[in-house]
Amino acid sequence: MNAYNKADSFSLESDSIKDVIHDYICWLSMTDEMRPSIGNVFKAMETFKIDAVRYYDGNIYELAKDINAMSFDGFIRSLQTIASKKDKLTVYGTMGLLSIVVDINKGCDISNIKFAAGIIILMEYIFDDTDMSHLKVALYRRIQRRDDVDR
C-alpha cells in the first residue's frame, strides 16, 4: 500500500488510477492512529468526498451507512443503490461516496480489511473505463491545482 500514500505527483502517462484508488481505500480502512501521513495524491483523493456532499440531495452519510459489501445480498443492494444514484452524484461524487463508506467503517481488525476489499470489488462493477479515465484526469488536475496553490 505504500506506493501512492506519500506521493506528491501523479502522471497521466505512467500512473494507474486503479492502483491509486486501491491504495487509497486500504489507507482509508485504517484507524486514524494507524494511517501513515499522506502526500498530494491522497490529499487530492480526499476532495472527492466534497463532491459527494455537494452533488447528493440528501444526507450523504446516511446513504453511506446503507452501503455494505460484506454479504452477497448487501453487495447486490449496494450496487443497485449506487447505480441508481450515480447520474446525480457523478463519477466524482460516487468516488467520494465510496470513500466516505470506507472512512466511516474504518478499523484495524480483519473485518475492516475485508470491507475495504469488498468496496474495491464494488468499484470494479460501478466504474467503467470511461469513468476511470475521468477520475484519472480529475485527480491529475486536482493535484496540479494544489501544486499551484502551494507555490
UniProtKB/Swiss-Prot annotation:
GO terms for molecular function: protein sequestering activity. It comes from Vaccinia virus (strain Western Reserve) (VACV). One of its GO terms (cellular component) is nucleus. Interacts with host TANK, TBKBP1 and AZI2; these interactions prevent interferon production. Interacts with host STAT2. Belongs to the orthopoxvirus OPG029 family. InterPro entries: Poxvirus_Bcl-2-like (IPR022819), Poxvirus_sf (IPR043018). Keywords: Early protein, Host-virus interaction, Inhibition of host innate immune response by virus, Inhibition of host interferon signaling pathway by virus, Inhibition of host TBK1 by virus, Inhibition of host TLR pathway by virus, Interferon antiviral system evasion, Viral immunoevasion. One of its GO terms (biological process) is symbiont-mediated suppression of host cytoplasmic pattern recognition receptor signaling pathway via inhibition of TBK1 activity. Prevents establishment of cellular antiviral state by blocking virus-induced phosphorylation and activation of interferon regulatory factors 3/IRF3 and 7/IRF7, transcription factors critical for the induction of interferons alpha and beta. This blockage is produced through the inhibition of host TBK1, by binding host TBK1 adapter proteins TBKBP1 and AZI2, thereby producing a strong inhibition of the phosphorylation and activation of IRF3 and IRF7. Also acts as an inhibitor of the cellular response to type I IFN by interacting with host STAT2. The gene is OPG029. This is IFN signaling evasion protein OPG029. It holds the Pfam family Poxv_Bcl-2-like. It comes from the Viruses. Induction: Expressed in the early phase of the viral replicative cycle.
